[in-house]
Amino acid sequence: MASVSANPLPRLILYHQTTHDPDGNLISILPLITQPEIRLTHIIVAAIHINEDPDGLTLNDRPPSDPRFTTLWAELRIAQASGITVLGMLGGAAKGSYTRLDADAASFERYYAPLAALIRARGLQGLDLDVEEPMSLGGVVRLVDRLRGDFGPGFVITLAPVATALLDPRRNLSGFDYAALEAMRGPQIAWYNAQFYCGWGDAHTPLLYEMCVARGWDPAKLVMGLVTTPDNGAGWVPFEVLAVTLRMLALRFPRFGGVMGWEYFNGRPGGKGRPWEWAQAMTRLLGTAGPGHAAVAAAESQAKPSPPVEIDPDSEQGVQVPIPRSFEYHTDDDNSDEDSK
């Protein structure tokens, strides 16, 4: 394994949700560690769901303690030991998690406690908040504050807005205004995994990313989210086109925040047989070699608590807009773990 880089940016992030093939065989993440020329900084395991029963927390559609996930959790520990930061993803296309966390204080405590217990039990180093249902600004601030208070300054808190939400709160799946959240709790949020796909952004050119920066977003905190294959959603960008976009962003923004990919198991060019090749391709396009994991983790652990801010629970929410393409949630009855993000 190559030595750790002193440069914490750009990040290279992969979501890992489809953890097993249709026959129930584990899709191993170990090649992301053992294969050459991969500089992966973060893995985000998805998707954690808070269900009606507060004690019925699930990873996709099974309890996180299900024997099906035993090897998955072990491999994630190996990834951590190799310097890759491992986060969980809460929410996604399946609704309900954030509605339950956005209720009164007593309800919040009931639903939050099992989530916190899961983070501790599995040694997750952070949580990605993928809010794809209406949530109040006060509700998301309360959640961020509680995570920071419970898990300390080294815990990585990220959010996953659609890219357009960073320009216009009306083009948003989350309800709250991300600019307002950044103004109130920016020091607590490590970065934003902005979705530049499925009709909510375009990575064929650097234009939308540049517009976000012009609007005031720090490029070091703005990660360009991509689909790793056309099978994972509209907006896939061929590598030769993406190379130009990333080169332009790196030249214009020396502290470019990096890229994330949705998701690992079938990414091009290797597809299901060699899914790690997407990370190899991105490592080349980003112009990096060798894992820079420790430097990234050190840079992200500098968040400091911010003073409390009075939140109006009746503050105006962003307008919910329709998802531009059909999303389907596949359960194990369909022999799949897939939950479109």
Model-based region annotation:
Residues 306-313, 323-340:
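Short linear regulatory motifs embedded in intrinsically disordered, acidic Ser/Thr-rich regions
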Residues 2-243, 253-256, 265-293:
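Chitinase-like catalytic core of GlcNAc-active glycosidases
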Residues 262:
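Functionally critical loop-and-helix segments that line ligand-binding/catalytic clefts
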Residues 245-249:
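Short glycine-rich, acidic/polar surface loops and turns
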Residues 295-299:
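Extracellular/luminal ectodomains of metazoan preproproteins built from arrays
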